[in-house]
């Protein structure tokens, strides 16, 4: 049984607080409480008929990630953990996140209702360093939560590829091969993957479900196939 110290966070909107607690509750429910075979993590975005937006995910990892809840206020000065040439910013929004191995933000929500979820993707290839600033993958989700209120804002910024992501080896010796899903309070969604050294973005409300491998374009193709053979009934 894992124990978590819940931080006190003062967000102005009660509705956002309820959504935050529900989303984090769903995330924590997926964390492994005992050793078990690894299965695929899944992120799901649901918009109810009354407009309520909920993002949930399972964390089907092969070991205890020693996760904790971290609460960050707005105004924190940060850098991307990439040495001398790394992005530097000051957080515009407060956030609550679930840590991974206590070295980075695996997922979370900011005070505007923007949610970020990192899932494993074996096909990730971040490319070669090319002189751009370098951002550690442990700060990728936090970079988004700190600076953007909506999915559209994040997409507009990240599609410019202002940095290169670097992925150090995890404490268990595995590579940190991840893709990023984000959603906001309106139900908008985007998926970010590095495939063949290039950033690929899928942006739209229809991208509501993401799992691990294969890459997201192939996940969409598989979904289309199963719909044609009665897999949705």
Q: Where do the language-model regions lie?
A:
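Bacterial N-terminal signal peptides that target proteins for export
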Residues: 2-22
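Extended amphipathic alpha-helical segments with heptad-repeat/coiled-coil character used for oligomerization
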Residues: 171-225
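Alpha/propeptide regions of enzymes that mature by internal proteolysis
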Residues: 47, 131-164
